[in-house]
């Protein structure tokens, strides 16, 4: 239920941001606010049904002030606080990013590799992501993960393409164990 609810709020906020011409900035603000409310100090406020609405609203306003949030995001946070729905903020931010990516015709790809990639290797993987998604605009994030042993893992919109040596070795080990019994 919270996924659907978060998506509905995200659609509404996207519409407001579109009208204001603040699509990207609103997404950044939502992600900052979601990360802030997910901090251990504020998490009890988000999850506790015993905290009254006035206290949640005061805290939400304080966070909005500290983060310098726009009126659109500030009002959203106040509404979520009033309705004791601040817990959906991380999902709402993810939905917003996803809807915004769709609207702007772009895709996100997370690239994990065992070693640092050269510019040519990175560009080749981005080109692969373009072919797989059919989108020309690709937002990429790279990460080195030595535990992969070799190869790369691509996460494109939640679909994982695992070409790591670690996974290949695990698959081979499993096949050998099953074949040997």
Descriptions of predicted regions:
Residues 1-181:
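Elongated, mostly alpha-helical coiled-coil "stalk/stator" tethers of large membrane protein machines
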């Amino acid at each position: 239920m919270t996924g659907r609810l978060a998506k509905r709020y995200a659609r509404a906020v996207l519409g407001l941001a579109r009208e204001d011409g603040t699509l990207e900035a609103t997404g950044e603000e939502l992600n900052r606010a979601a990360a802030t409310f997910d901090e251990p100090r504020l998490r009890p406020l988000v999850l506790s049904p015993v905290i009254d609405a006035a206290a949640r609203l005061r805290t939400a306003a304080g966070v909005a002030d500290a983060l310098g949030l726009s009126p659109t995001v500030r009002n959203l946070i106040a509404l979520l606080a009033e309705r004791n729905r601040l817990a959906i903020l991380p999902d709402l931010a993810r939905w917003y990013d996803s809807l915004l990516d769709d609207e702007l015709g772009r895709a996100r790809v997370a690239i994990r590799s065992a070693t640092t990639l050269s510019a040519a290797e990175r560009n080749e993987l981005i080109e692969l992501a373009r072919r797989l998604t059919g989108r020309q605009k690709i937002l990429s994030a790279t990460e080195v993960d030595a535990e992969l042993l070799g190869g790369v893992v691509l996460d494109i919109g939640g679909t994982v393409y695992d070409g790591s040596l670690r996974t290949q070795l695990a698959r081979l080990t499993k096949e050998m164990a099953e074949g040997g019994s």
